[in-house]
From Swiss-Prot:
One GO CC annotation: cytoplasm
Keyword Transport: no
Compartments in which it is found: Nucleus; Cytoplasm
Full protein name: E3 ubiquitin-protein ligase ari-1.1
A Pfam family recorded for this sequence: Ariadne
Record keywords: Cytoplasm, Metal-binding, Nucleus, Repeat, Transferase, Ubl conjugation pathway, Zinc, Zinc-finger
Length: 494
């Protein structure tokens, strides 16, 4: 194979056919999956407009974008995909930069897609620099060559083990990216080919700011929006998540504070708080000491120190005289500073645990109340046997849906409140939070304990009254949070 095969100018028709047979799907149709969404879930975003795309839909959409750009650039499909990847699949940005160059070759060189100097590879057999075998060598336009088996092994490793879709030349310090047509020429294993196709689609989603993978377990679909912003999106699998950060929908706390909160919950920062609150450092050598008895007369365990001090005031023990079990030394400034720092650590830990326990409490309730769907389903079936239609009994499922949304909102209000500076607006927020929490607990208790105690005549009215009021309280809280954000009323301590 000569280097002429690597010159990136080519007829669009032939290159399109080459990639269609190996790397891309033949299905040009875009399959869109949608699910009905509640406009009340959006804040100042209008009607929901996100679309759900499966793998074939993504691949077809990617092909269409490549074809549109290829018609202008007149380059191979694989080269076009590499360029679009570099520009995060923003074809307007790519074409704008393209028109700033005098010709296609200059543009490709500046984009590091082809080398500045392209040399024809010598014909005939030669020794492979990788495996030292003698035979026909092939390579890229950068003039780096190897035997077919070495290229195959290199590319297979990059795809199967390193999960790469943008693969550089195997030569050290060569940054030339290998186009899809060349990759597909060397790779013959159907499993590796399928993996490569999936990686290409994955890179398409991950570099496109208007696409986001659904975090649902084994979902495999992506959600597309018309414009980027932190917002609720709903996948056809039922997952509801934030388009900005990919986490479960977390209104009212924003993505930045949620990230800080989750890090605080998951890392060892609170272990450090516990150490600060329950241990002290030797005033002399600063080794950490945990008190394991009632006596306040402490001796440092460090054999090189053995300093004796008072646990209460952290001052030297000797001046305490006979005060073996109490400390009356309150005038030492260094000891006072040590005690103050200790109290601050304890207070911070208690404050964190207050919000963390309530956050986790609502999270646990959300999981446990998932069982209510089975209870409600049984009740709905029972009611249908008593002459009520399927539509007439849907109020029970609606009640559980509202309960779940309120639990999720309450859970994240505690992350929001943890960072919120206390002022008049924070007091209003806490009042709304309290009202929502109280009404949510009442709805939960009714659904768990009182369904069977009500006759069918009054049950529907009571359930609807309860979930509508709870839904109203949730809206009041979220509207207040949204207005506060718009008017920049919230002050956070990070």
């Amino acid at each position: 194979m000569s280097s002429d095969d690597e010159i990136n100018m080519d007829d669009s028709d032939s290159s399109q056919g080459e990639i269609d047979d190996g790397c891309m799907s033949d299905d040009d149709g875009i399959v869109l999956e949608s699910r009905e969404q509640n406009s009340s879930d959006y804040k100042d975003n209008g009607e929901p407009d996100n679309e759900v795309l499966n793998h074939d839909s993504l691949e077809a959409e990617m092909k269409k974008t490549i074809t549109d750009v290829q018609a202008v650039l007149q380059v191979k499909t694989g080269v076009c995909r590499i360029l679009l990847h570099k520009y995060k699949w923003n074809k307007e940005s790519l074409l704008e930069r393209f028109y700033e160059h005098p010709d296609t070759t200059t543009f490709l060189i500046d984009a590091h897609v082809i080398p500045r100097r392209q040399e024809r590879l010598p014909a005939g057999d030669a020794e492979c620099d990788i495996c030292c075998s003698l035979g026909e060598l092939s390579g890229l336009s950068c003039n780096h060559r190897a035997c077919t088996q070495c290229w195959k092994a290199y590319l297979t490793n990059k795809i199967a083990n390193n999960a790469q879709s943008e693969i550089e030349c195997m030569a050290p310090n060569c940054k030339l990216l290998i186009e899809d047509e060349k990759v597909m020429f060397y790779i013959t294993d159907p499993t590796v080919i399928a993996t490569y196709r999936k990686l290409i689609v994955a890179s398409y989603v991950e570099t496109n700011r208007l696409l986001k993978w659904c975090p649902g377990i084994d979902c495999g679909k992506a959600v597309r929006v018309s414009h980027w912003e932190p917002r609720l999106v709903v996948c056809s699998c039922g997952s509801r998540f934030c388009f900005s950060c990919g986490h479960d929908w977390h209104e009212p706390v924003n993505c930045r504070l949620l990230k800080l909160w989750l890090k605080k919950c998951n890392d060892d920062s609170e272990t450090s708080n516990w150490i600060n609150a329950n241990t002290k450092e030797c005033p002399k050598c600063m080794i950490t000491i945990e008190k394991d008895g009632g006596c306040n007369h402490m001796t440092c365990k460090n054999t090189a120190c053995r300093f004796e001090f008072c646990w209460m005031c952290l001052g030297p023990w000797e001046p305490h005289g006979s005060s073996w079990y109490s400390c009356n030394r309150f005038d030492d400034s260094a000891a006072k500073n040590a005690r103050d720092a200790q109290e601050v650590s304890r207070a911070n830990l208690q404050r964190y645990l207050f919000y963390y326990n309530r956050y986790m409490g609502h999270q646990q309730s959300l999981r446990l109340e998932g069982k209510l769907y089975a209870t409600v389903k049984s009740k709905m079936e029972q009611m249908q046997t008593l002459s009520m239609s399927w539509i007439e009994v849907q109020f029970l499922r609606k009640a559980v849906d509202v309960l779940s949304e309120c639990r999720r909102t309450l859970m994240f209000t505690y992350a929001f409140a943890f960072y919120l500076k206390r002022d008049n607006n924070a007091i209003i927020f806490e009042s709304n939070q309290k009202d929502l929490e109280m009404e949510t607990e009442q709805l939960s208790g009714f659904l768990e304990r009182d369904l069977d105690n009500e006759n069918l005549v009054t049950l529907k009215q009571k359930v609807q009254d309860k979930y509508r009021y709870v839904e109203h309280r949730r809206k009041v809280l979220l509207d207040h949070c949204s207005e506060g954000a718009d008017q920049e009323l919230w002050v956070f301590n990070e």
